[in-house]
UniProtKB/Swiss-Prot annotation:
Substrate binds at residues 83-85, 121-122. This is Cyclic pyranopterin monophosphate synthase. The active site is at 136. The lineage of its organism: Bacteria, Bacillati, Cyanobacteriota, Cyanophyceae, Nostocales. PANTHER family: CYCLIC PYRANOPTERIN MONOPHOSPHATE SYNTHASE, MOLYBDOPTERIN COFACTOR SYNTHESIS PROTEIN A. It comes from Nostoc sp. (strain PCC 7120 / SAG 25.82 / UTEX 2576).
Amino acid sequence: MQAPFPKNSANLTHLDGQGQAQMVDVSDKAQTIRQAVAAAQVRMLPATLEAIQAGNTPKGDVLATARLAGIMAAKQTANLIPLCHPLPLQKVAVEITPDPQLPGYQIQATVKTKAETGVEMEALTAVSIAALTLYDMAKALEKSMQIESIRLVSKTGGKSGDYFPPAP
């Protein structure tokens, strides 16, 4: 059974005239500098945080592996999310910072391109996969870790302008 076609679909660029999903044609758009920042957090027991910080983990360097996984994931976004355009990425930076107050880690990804469309999904994919990899690398220490608050922190450039949501 097909979902009902939205009545206000005239402005929904990912739907064709019959309400079917389509990849948006961006060929007429100008290439501009675009940047997006996304964040996530991984909550864990204080002992797990301490073990990761000390390098006492069975799988090796948790943070380096998670950071690289996030970078690699940003580059694969168009292969993972059906209607995303493959984009040339000029920058992907993933930062993973310990947060003893959480306790756990704060993850932030910054992605930059010069293209016809934005890199929000690339930044969100980067933090998501970095968080999943951190979990995978440390699950032998704790299976109750929680991945939380995956969100867009900011985006700049493009037709829709800059976006800075209120703090959570």
